Amino acid sequence: MKIVAICGSHRKGNTEWMLNKLAERLKENGAEVELILLRKTDVKMCLACLKCEEGGKDRQGICKIQDDMNAIYPKLTAADCIVLGTPAYFDLMTGLLKNFLDRTCAIWPHLEGKSLAGVAVVEEGIGQAIQNIKSYGDICGMKWVGSVTGLAKNPGDIAKDKSVTRRLLKLADKITDIG
């Protein structure tokens, strides 16, 4: 089973920790996992030029923008499951993750039927970050596996919450059971 985890955080902190903890268990369960840190990529904003829509549902990740998405598209289309992680900014996913998701327009027909999971770090409440991720999956025709949210503000806070760790391990098991 191939899993691509996307970290939409601007810093190395709680979201990345959650994705790494999830990836650890997924690997123990025999999955092949790649973590992509969006903060270390060059992913430009979508220009809404619609070049990617040429070819209809047969489109193959053709985007006129030449950046790191060209290397990421094949990883997403080859994955059985995609895990999206984000801290919540004003209750929503980060702009970094939203920008990335906008750029997947070039391949969205190839995401249909894939599994999708989400993790989010929030300072208070649950916010809409996970609902944003789930809505993205619904639009792409993906199968929702589940999510884990954790409360934290400062880097390292989330690792202290043992219930988050337990829920991450359960989510990892659920992902590999489906695959």
For each feature predicted by the language model, list its residue ranges.
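Short, surface-exposed, charge-dense and proline/glycine-enriched linear segments
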Residues: 63-73, 115-120, 142-151, 176-179
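A short, mixed-charge helix-start or loop-turn motif at secondary-structure junctions
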Residues: 4-5, 115-116, 154
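Short, glycine-/small-residue-rich phosphate/pyrophosphate-handling segment
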Residues: 94-95, 106-150
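A short acidic, helix-capping loop that chelates divalent metal ions and anchors anionic groups
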Residues: 152-158
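Alpha-helical membrane-embedding segments
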Residues: 136-138, 154, 174-175
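Conserved residues at the C-terminal ends of beta-strands
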Residues: 39, 85, 122, 150-151
